[in-house]
């Protein structure tokens, strides 16, 4: 019996030592960056958004960046301490009564319930690709993609995904992401309220957003509006809104 207890004690000590060494090798730093609270682990070249700062809670629009301080943003939530795997957390501090829409620049994972305490959030825009999973939180919001990615992901029974109706183009050959810099979605007949961050291109200066590839007529975010809503009667005899794209093209100087 004593020998057995001794073995159990040794195993317990070894386990505790392993956990302590693991904790030491993965030292944690919690910092504020822009509108976000962020967690860094010294043993990983990644960053984890854990919540919003006080200023972040007052923003109507938020962009989830691809990188923070040179580290790829891989998750909204926590890292599993024991396995080191991603653990999207429903308890992350993403709380806001003001936030209306979230833009994902890259593929960052989370859960729909991550935003369950953002009572006014209605739209999530995926600039690159899908990166948020469904769960049983019962959060009601809509998800938007480029038309091409929407067609790939389209499910006739899914009432939450839509093609974005505002498409910002890099406007040069060989651009990444099929030439899309940004996408957005606003009601037809309305102004575009959110102006995306300025794109960058080596050797060039960004010169504004234009209505055609030749960059003749600049889009005025103060006065220009999207086309008026048009409807048609579908095969089931129901009225539905006709999808209309508004493409804006970057000018390079």
Predicted regions and their residues:
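Bacterial N-terminal signal peptides that target proteins for export
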Residues: 1-13
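Structural signature of tandem-repeat unit edges
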Residues: 8, 37, 42-45, 57-74, ...
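Bacterial N-terminal signal peptides
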Residues: 11-22
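N-terminal Sec signal peptide cleavage junction
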Residues: 24-27
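Extracellular/luminal ectodomains and secreted, surface-exposed scaffolds of diverse proteins
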Residues: 33-42, 219-221
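Acidic, Ser/Thr
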Residues: 53-55, 79-94, 195-202
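Secondary-structure capping and domain/repeat boundary segments
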Residues: 62, 132-134, 138-253
């Amino acid at each position: 019996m004593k020998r057995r207890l001794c073995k159990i004690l040794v195993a317990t000590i070894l386990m505790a030592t392993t956990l302590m060494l693991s904790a030491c090798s993965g030292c944690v730093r919690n910092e504020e960056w822009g509108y976000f609270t962020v967690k860094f682990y010294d043993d990983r070249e990644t960053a984890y958004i854990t919540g919003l700062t006080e200023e972040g809670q007052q923003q109507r629009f938020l962009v989830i960046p691809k990188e923070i301080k040179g580290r790829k943003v891989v998750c909204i939530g926590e890292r599993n301490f024991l396995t080191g795997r991603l653990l999207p957390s429903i308890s992350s501090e993403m709380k806001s009564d003001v936030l209306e829409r979230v833009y994902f620049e890259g593929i960052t994972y989370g859960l729909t319930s991550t935003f369950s305490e953002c009572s006014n959030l209605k739209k999530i825009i995926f600039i690159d690709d899908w990166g948020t999973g469904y769960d049983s939180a019962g959060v009601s919001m809509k998800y938007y993609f480029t038309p091409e990615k929407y067609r790939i992901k389209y499910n006739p029974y899914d009432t939450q995904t839509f093609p974005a109706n505002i498409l910002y183009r890099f406007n040069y050959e060989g651009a990444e992401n099929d030439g899309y810099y940004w996408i957005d979605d606003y009601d037809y007949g309305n102004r575009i309220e959110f102006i995306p961050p300025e794109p960058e291109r080596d050797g060039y200066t960004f010169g504004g957003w234009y209505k055609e590839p030749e960059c003749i007529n600049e889009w005025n975010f103060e006065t220009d509006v999207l086309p008026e809503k048009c409807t048609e009667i579908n095969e089931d005899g129901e009225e539905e809104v006709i999808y209309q794209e508004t493409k804006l093209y970057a000018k390079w100087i």
